[in-house]
Amino acid sequence: MFFSRISTIVSMTALFASALAMPTTLTSRQDAICSSGNPQCCDVDVLGVADLDCEAPPAAYTDIKSFSDVCADVGKINMCCDLPVLGQGLICSSPDNS
């Protein structure tokens, strides 16, 4: 009985020590850039009402700058559109309010 308690204590200590010794890794995630809309890469913005030739960003982004860079890489501007319909964005705004 004494041996089983020592064995349990040693096992638990080893378990906790190995859990503490493992490094944590963080992965970047997308921020909520478009709080009330869908992120889109669009060709032309028409007075914030309609945007033409929109598509979902072709690559991952983590913040507004990287979202802008992803869209610029395909020759488009970054927009947040409330209603993306058939390649057109309706009621769109810039994610950085510029």
From Swiss-Prot:
Residues 1-21 form the signal peptide. Pfam families: Hydrophobin_2. Its main location: secreted. It is found in: Secreted; Secreted, Cell wall. Disruption phenotype: Does not seem to affect germination and growth, formation of sclerotia, ability to penetrate and infect host tissue, nor spore and mycelium surface properties. The keyword Signal applies. One of its GO terms (cellular component) is extracellular region. The keyword Signal applies. It comes from the Eukaryota. Disulfide bonds join 34-80, 41-71, 42-54, 81-92. Keywords: Cell wall, Disulfide bond, Secreted, Signal. Aerial growth, conidiation, and dispersal of filamentous fungi in the environment rely upon a capability of their secreting small amphipathic proteins called hydrophobins (HPBs) with low sequence identity. Class I can self-assemble into an outermost layer of rodlet bundles on aerial cell surfaces, conferring cellular hydrophobicity that supports fungal growth, development and dispersal; whereas Class II form highly ordered films at water-air interfaces through intermolecular interactions but contribute nothing to the rodlet structure. Belongs to the cerato-ulmin hydrophobin family. This is Class II hydrophobin 2. The gene is Bhp2.
